[in-house]
């Protein structure tokens, strides 16, 4: 008989630090070149158990809160260095926009000593969890690249104090943020539905050794 239990849900929780902030920080030569790379941080939380079902129950007790109890989640911190340049004709141009992005992954860490068959089952499970969360990370990175592409060269006429161009940018940031969040929700729904990749991972762990 299959052993099942209530399943904590995977949830994507986008924690944003300074996402809409327009930071007027002097730009270095590296920043002006447009080259940048995201940083990555991996957090784990300890769980206990000597079988798949015990490990999963521990996840339910200790997992991160991301709106609901979660198995894992992906968050990020994003700030910007931007340079707005008033033009001689009264317009304003956003000349440079450099992101500082950190993608933060959180997932469970099993005990170091597990029975061999349980350890093998766990490794398959956690590898699938990481694969799932890294797709969310790619969604975040894609959003930031879209923001960067939209930002650089953005121009507003009759804007000597660079207020109009900021307002236009803020509206687009909101649209791209909403798009990314919906993309994450859609992906979770696909993966967690009956027969989905994450659903299968959970069942294999719970019903395994």
Region spans (language model):
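Bacterial N-terminal signal peptides
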Residues: 13-26
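N-terminal secretory signal peptides that target proteins for export/translocation
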Residues: 1-10
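Post-HEXXH active-site segment of zinc metalloproteases
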Residues: 113-124, 140-173
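Active-site recognition of the HExxH zinc-binding catalytic motif
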Residues: 128-140
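Sec/Tat signal peptide C-region and signal peptidase I cleavage site
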Residues: 27-31
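Metalloprotease/metallohydrolase-associated module, dominated by Zn2+-dependent proteases
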Residues: 34-113, 157-209
């Amino acid at each position: 008989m299959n052993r099942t239990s209530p399943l904590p849900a995977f949830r994507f929780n986008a924690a944003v630090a300074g996402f809409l902030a327009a930071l007027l920080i002097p730009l270095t030569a590296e920043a002006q070149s447009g080259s940048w790379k995201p940083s990555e941080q991996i957090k784990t939380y300890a769980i206990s158990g000597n079988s798949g079902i015990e490990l999963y129950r521990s996840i339910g007790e200790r997992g991160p809160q991301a709106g609901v109890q979660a198995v894992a989640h992906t968050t990020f911190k994003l700030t910007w260095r931007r340079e707005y340049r008033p033009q001689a004709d009264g317009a304003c141009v956003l000349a440079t926009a450099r992101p500082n992005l950190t993608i933060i992954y959180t997932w469970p860490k099993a005990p170091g000593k597990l029975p061999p068959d349980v350890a093998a089952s766990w490794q398959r499970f956690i590898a699938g969890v990481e694969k799932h969360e890294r797709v969310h990370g790619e969604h975040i990175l894609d959003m930031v690249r879209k923001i960067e592409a939209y930002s650089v060269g953005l121009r507003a006429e009759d804007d000597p104090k660079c207020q109009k161009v900021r307002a236009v940018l803020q509206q687009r940031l909101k649209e791209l943020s909403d798009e990314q969040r919906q993309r994450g929700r859609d992906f979770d729904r696909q993966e967690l539905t009956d027969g989905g990749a994450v659903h299968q991972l959970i069942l294999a762990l719970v019903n395994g050794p």
